[in-house]
Amino acid sequence: LADYKGQVVLLNIWGTFCLPCRDEMPAIEKLNQAMAPKGLRVVAVSIDEPGAEAKIRSFAKEFGLTFQILYNPSGAMENAYQTTGVPETFVIARDGVIRKKVIGASDWNSDGNRALIAQLLAERGR
């Protein structure tokens, strides 16, 4: 994620096996479509077991996902962000500070979430 330094990032940790993850993906894609042109970077990190690459590709195709999807079966991402399950999502400001953390599914395309992201996009790095 160091590649995204200085950018506003929505980091979603998920798995193909997770029903709430399936529920929230369409809203994440809608948010991405609306806010990526303004500078938001959406990164979804799958924590599926080793060997799940085809499953992950199929999931992304099924939902028409256009944002970056990473695969981290080692557990390093869960350790780094001290997650307790999936989905778990972080909104990270340009300065690298986590501004919002949500455990469980959320409507990421809601007015409140879009307003937060718009505010963070308007802020310049500190």
Question: Where are the predicted features?
Answer:
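Structural microenvironment flanking redox-active thiols in thiol-disulfide oxidoreductases
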Residues: 22-63, 73-80
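Conserved hydrophobic packing residues within short motifs/helices of P-loop NTPase cores
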Residues: 9-11, 43-45, 90
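Non-globular targeting/processing and membrane-anchoring segments
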Residues: 124-126
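Aromatic-flanked redox-active Cys/Sec active sites in thiol-based oxidoreductases
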Residues: 12-18, 47
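Thiol/disulfide oxidoreductase modules built on the thioredoxin-like
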Residues: 58-66, 71-119
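Short amphipathic alpha-helical/adjacent loop interface patches that line ligand
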Residues: 8, 25-28, 114
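A short beta-strand-turn-helix
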Residues: 1-9
